[in-house]
């Protein structure tokens, strides 16, 4: 697993994001519930976070993820990339995704 302490800072457009193996998730009316089996913590994602999580069913780069999200959300590209990097960095810190 990548260094999760600095995961947000280490992300580049070519960083590949993969869902961690030690977790399970389910859709709850458009939101996402996730449990990390490693630490026993449950997490909840709002509809935007749930959309990102579902896109990560297959490993994607930050660039690919942002391209998919840009088709749905009317937001400035630089803002989108920044927000995605922060979000993915937090998921990595919680052990929910791996970054390569």
Task: Name what the model sees in each region.
Residues 2, 28, 41-100:
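Long, charge-rich, low-complexity alpha-helical segments
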Residues 16-36:
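Short boundary/linker motifs that mark transitions into or out of structured domains
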Residues 1-23:
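Hydrophobic packing positions characteristic
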Residues 6, 36-39:
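Detector for Asparagine
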């Amino acid at each position: 697993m990548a260094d999760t302490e600095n995961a947000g800072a280490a992300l580049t457009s070519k960083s590949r994001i993969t869902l961690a193996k030690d977790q399970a998730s389910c859709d709850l009316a458009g939101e996402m519930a996730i449990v990390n089996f490693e630490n026993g913590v449950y997490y909840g994602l709002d509809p935007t976070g749930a959309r990102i999580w579902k896109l990560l069913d297959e490993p994607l780069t930050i660039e690919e993820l942002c391209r998919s999200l840009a088709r749905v959300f009317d937001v400035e590209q630089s803002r989108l990339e920044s927000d995605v990097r922060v979000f993915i960095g937090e998921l990595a810190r919680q052990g929910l995704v791996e970054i390569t």
